[in-house]
Design a protein with these regions (language model features):
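Polytopic membrane enzymes that build or remodel cell-surface glycoconjugates and lipids
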Residues: 2-478, 545
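Intrinsically disordered, polar/acidic, low-complexity terminal segments
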Residues: 56-60, 321-328, 345, 400-613
Length: 613
């Protein structure tokens, strides 16, 4: 599997020369540096992204401007949002930081102290320079690629196939968001220290380096302090124990004890200080909702694998209904078994990659699927793909020779090679930069919200926002960051991109019909899980507003809600807005007995926004 030599007796063809040059580069001693540099170059558009989406919310926290005080030191508070205290949740619902349908036990607090520390340093050193914050993230991504390259070479040897795996990992467009989005930097840190842990563990168990026994536990602790994504390391350690460790079985599992103790200590701290999530359908806590978590794993796992292996993004899992899983999952499983079984049967390293990749799906199954979660899944997938391609090219005799396997396998192999080695690196800069128009789609309309000082004595009501997390929360966050007046509360009559019908019942009341249900869209279930449903007839009272559920959809929650205000809807204390063609414009409530309809948010508004730039 080393780089092949050119035949000195005959002049080699152009393709053979290119092949020789490529494989020679893939065994270069400085390949880790080369690939780290390549990864930075492909993700350089991140330097011009600025702050986007969650970044604005993190800015309010790190600058001490957030209306929510987590109780943690600012240095560690970037990922500790809502603590589940019912009084605090009610106060934030009154302000509009949380919508009226929020679970009273809503909690999102992540034990990401190391990642938070890196963000705190950004705001201490260059608070007004987002480009330097992005450069900081890109350096972490470069370090991650270098660490992955060293790990592939240590596990697979100095052959060109290890270099190919590292190249596939470095240019994977699934890594765009972790590299480009400041709020997702925690994934880079978790993967960086996690891969260092695996490298050190192999150095201890196979190479006999005693200092690595301590190093792998230290790296595991740092990975866990960076983000929950690092739990995937446990899956790879188990896979290593089963397939790569050559000692007696009892010694293999005994060697896992130091890492197990680190995981146990982390878990005790995590649960003792109430980290984690509760009441949210966007994040599913496996300890609180085990059945829902297993259901999510079955639904989301295939889409996560789809996002890793194919050009289709894992985000498809947010828009395709569960019934399609009954068809899609067996087909995907059959494809992987068909393609990889001969390799898995013959090669223990391939078995290590496969099991590590599969087990790394578990920690991310509790989150809405997305390519940004695939840093550990990709580690095993790219190792497998490199071995598959090298076997098809160099040692076809190791695989079945019958046309019924070889022709489809070669076809799929060529497709995967073209996608991952050509299309993916070409797309990576564009996927990185796509975060900017996505962020501006939600942030730019905030400029159309009035800066009149009177608004500080008014309640702002948005009747049809595209969603709540970014549309409504960014109004308050951006106004606070810009030092401009902000409404005393912000309300939304719906929380997703769905058609509405609003009927005026009397001077103070509206009936809102939400076609399909309130909890639609990517973030529809963020604030309330299916295990804690709203009920028919339930009424929630906030300061200046009550909401009563008058019709329900079994899957997507309230289909009809009656809103009642303590004053007539035309009162000067209320300021009404509607979302129209990518911007906010004034809305006049209809006369009593009359209705007004809104179509769902046009997805092309994202590309053809007519609001201010």
């Amino acid at each position: 599997m080393h780089s092949p030599q050119l035949n000195g007796d005959k002049k080699p063809s152009r393709w053979k020369r290119l092949w020789y040059m490529g494989t020679t580069w893939l065994i270069h001693t400085r390949l880790a540096f080369h690939l780290a540099l390549l990864a930075m170059i492909l993700t350089l558009p991140a330097l011009w992204l600025g702050w986007q989406l969650d970044d604005h919310l993190h800015r309010t926290v790190m600058m001490g401007l957030s209306p929510f005080k987590s109780g943690h030191l600012k240095i560690f508070s970037a990922f500790t949002f809502f603590n589940g205290d019912s009084e605090t949740i009610r106060r934030l619902m009154d302000l509009g930081v949380l919508p009226w349908w929020t679970s009273p036990h809503f909690r999102i607090e992540f034990f990401r102290y190391l990642s938070s520390l890196t963000m705190w340093l950004d705001y201490r050193l260059w608070p007004d320079w987002p480009s330097l914050m992005h450069l900081h993230s890109l350096l972490w991504y470069a370090g991650l690629v270098a660490a992955a390259t060293c790990f592939y070479r240590q596990i697979m040897g100095p052959a060109w196939v290890a270099g190919l795996a590292a190249l596939l990992y470095a240019v994977d467009d699934a890594h765009a968001l972790p590299a480009a989005w400041l709020a997702n930097r925690n994934a880079l840190l978790a993967a960086f220290f996690g891969i260092l842990c695996l490298t050190a563990y192999d150095g201890w168990r196979r190479l006999g380096k005693k200092w690595c026994a301590l190093a792998h536990t230290a790296c595991l602790a740092l990975a866990l302090l960076s983000g929950e994504l690092a739990l995937a390391v446990a899956g790879y350690l188990l896979a290593y124990t089963l397939f790569l460790d050559q000692s007696r079985l009892s010694r293999r599992f005994l060697a896992l004890l130091p890492a197990a103790l680190v995981l146990l200590a982390w878990a005790i701290l995590y649960w003792s200080f109430d980290f984690g999530t509760k009441g949210s359908g966007f994040y599913i806590n496996p300890l609180i909702s085990p059945v829902e978590f297993i259901r999510a794993l079955v639904h989301r796992g295939p889409f996560l694998l789809l996002g890793q292996w194919s050009p289709l993004p894992a985000e498809l899992g947010t828009i395709i209904s569960g019934k399609w899983i009954l068809i899609f999952f067996p087909v995907l499983l059959a494809f992987l078994v068909f393609l990889l079984f001969p390799l898995i049967r013959l090669d223990k390293i391939a078995r290590f990659w496969l099991l590590g990749m599969t087990l790394s799906l578990v920690p991310i199954a509790g989150v809405v699927p997305g390519n940004r979660l695939l840093l550990f899944v990709g580690l095993g997938a790219m190792g497998l793909l490199a071995q598959l391609l090298s076997g098809l090219i160099e040692k076809p005799g190791k695989f079945p020779g019958r046309p019924s396997w070889r022709i489809p396998a070669l076809t799929l192999g060529i497709f995967l090679m073209l996608f991952h080695l050509i299309l993916s690196p070409l797309c990576l800069p564009g996927v990185v930069y796509s975060l900017k128009p996505l962020g501006e789609f939600f942030a730019s309309p905030v400029k159309t919200v009035s800066d009149d000082p009177k608004i500080s004595r008014q309640d702002l009501i948005v009747v049809n926002p595209p969603d709540y997390l970014f549309s409504i929360n960014l109004i308050g966050a951006l106004k606070i960051l810009e030092g401009k007046p902000i409404a005393r509360s912000i309300r939304a009559l719906s929380g997703g991109p769905v058609p509405l019908e609003i009927q005026r019942l009397d001077q103070c009341s509206l009936r809102v019909k939400i076609h399909g249900g309130l909890f639609q869209g990517v973030t529809g279930r963020l604030y309330r899980s299916q295990e804690e449903p709203l009920t028919l007839g339930q009424e929630i009272h906030l300061r200046g507003l009550s909401a009563r559920v008058t019709r329900m959809d079994q899957d997507y929650g309230p289909e009809e809600v009656v809103y009642r205000f303590p004053v007539p809807l035309e009162d000067a204390s209320l300021r009404w807005l509607k979302w129209e063609k990518g911007t906010y414009v004034p809305f006049i409530p209809p006369p009593i007995g009359k209705s007004v309809r809104f179509s769902g948010i046009d997805p092309f508004d994202f590309f053809q926004r007519q609001g201010p730039s």
